[in-house]
């Protein structure tokens, strides 16, 4: 089931950019060999490091529990992280009378009215053709939402971001840049050439191993991988800078770094939900622990393994596992340690096999050919009405996006 949802997640995320204006290109679209681009979203530039860039241009990955969006930056890679159970709202020590958001009466024109009567009024308004009154009354059926979280109305929260800050690279000197999401394997990649060295990053979120895996390589020439790894939880609504400060999005956490592993552990202030993430950095060069980061130096191959979890449990009335912070730490560490005991090729093979078990059940051939144009260029031609017949078959404008970084973001 989860693998199927992962397939749907990737497939339906394809056309999310089709619903938005496409930024103008400043140079000719770089062409690629067509057979390399079958079932791929690919671009010749990074996603803007902004809310708009996240929503329309980052590359989404997920395993039904952990979500990741890859921006593909050159001097700084940003991978936005999510964990499906990280919600504010619900039972809390500050809400002893919390009743699941159910309300028995609501205020209609200054009078507390039973919900059953409101429903009857809505039906009568629709029947008489008074849609404006019906719509106004429908709003009375919705639980109260407030940023302070006093009513227990919850929001889905961004976990935070993993940042890879690269050293010794001048972005303007990079060539042959390509950022792609392969729908056949559910792997997001970034590659480019710099000073005679070919740099590649691969990312996937494995359902069998319950981890996000990021692999970086540097081949050819004398170039090495030199960068810092950081994991920064969000303390703002939706993980963006657009709505900071409200209590229902705030959290407390500690970051510890030991032996090339970054552990973030904390609680949400609103409902005391515990969360934990662990990120292990494995490199063929050197790794150095910092206060809140791991520094990689002189490497040609680096694997980063991350897992995230909370103490949420779908069980009335507390909706918690009852785990201590230490027990949650042990559980997340177990995922990471088991995955780290496998080599990268094994992790990737496990992921691809699991994903393709579902994805390859159906193959739809519309007579299209792999495109030699980037995905954003295809969308530009489609919107302008200049796409060829074959290119129109590649358009995803008929499908529906499933991701949103806002507080009501949908996640499988």
Which residues are covered by each model-predicted region?
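Sec-dependent signal peptide cleavage junction
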Residues: 10-26
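Aromatic-residue-lined binding/catalytic grooves and analogous aromatic/hydrophobic interfacial grooves
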Residues: 22-412
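Sec-dependent N-terminal signal peptides
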Residues: 1-8
């Amino acid at each position: 089931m989860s693998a199927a949802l992962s397939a749907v997640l990737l497939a339906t995320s394809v056309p999310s950019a089709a619903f938005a204006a496409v930024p103008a290109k400043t140079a000719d679209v770089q062409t690629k060999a067509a057979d390399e681009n079958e079932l791929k979203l690919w671009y010749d530039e990074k996603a803007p490091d902004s809310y708009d860039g996240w929503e329309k241009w980052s590359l989404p990955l997920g395993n039904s529990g952990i979500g990741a969006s890859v921006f593909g930056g050159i001097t700084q890679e940003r991978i936005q992280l999510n964990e499906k159970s990280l919600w504010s709202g619900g039972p809390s020590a500050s809400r002893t009378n919390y009743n699941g958001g159910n309300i028995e009466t609501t205020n209609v024109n200054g009078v507390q009215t039973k919900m059953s009567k409101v429903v009857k009024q809505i039906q009568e308004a629709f029947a008489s053709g008074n849609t404006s009154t019906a719509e106004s009354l429908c709003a009375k059926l919705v639980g109260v939402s407030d940023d302070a979280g006093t009513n227990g109305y919850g929001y889905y929260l961004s976990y935070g971001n993993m940042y890879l800050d690269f050293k010794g690279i001048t972005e303007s000197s990079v060539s042959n840049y390509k950022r792609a999401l392969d729908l056949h394997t559910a792997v997001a990649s970034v590659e480019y050439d710099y000073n005679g060295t070919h740099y590649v990053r691969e990312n996937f979120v494995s359902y069998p191993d319950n981890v996000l895996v990021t692999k970086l390589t540097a081949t050819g020439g004398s170039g090495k991988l030199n960068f810092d790894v950081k994991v920064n939880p969000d303390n703002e609504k939706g993980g963006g800078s657009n709505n900071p400060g409200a209590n229902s999005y705030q959290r407390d956490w500690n970051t510890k770094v030991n032996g090339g592993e970054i552990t973030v552990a904390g609680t949400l202030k609103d409902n005391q939900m515990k969360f934990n993430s662990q990120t292990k950095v494995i490199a063929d060069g050197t790794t150095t622990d910092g206060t809140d980061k791991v520094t990689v130096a002189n490497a040609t191959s680096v694997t980063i393994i991350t897992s995230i979890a909370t103490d949420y449990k779908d069980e009335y009335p507390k909706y918690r596992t009852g785990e201590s912070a230490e027990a949650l730490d042990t559980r997340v560490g177990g995922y990471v340690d088991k995955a780290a005991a496998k080599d990268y090729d094994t992790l990737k093979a496990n992921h691809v096999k699991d994903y393709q078990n579902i994805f390859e059940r159906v193959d739809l051939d519309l007579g299209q050919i792999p495109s030699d144009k980037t995905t954003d260029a295809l969308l530009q031609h489609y919107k302008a009405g200049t796409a060829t017949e074959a290119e129109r078959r590649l358009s995803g404008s008929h499908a529906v996006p499933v991701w949103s970084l806002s507080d009501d973001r949908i996640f499988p």
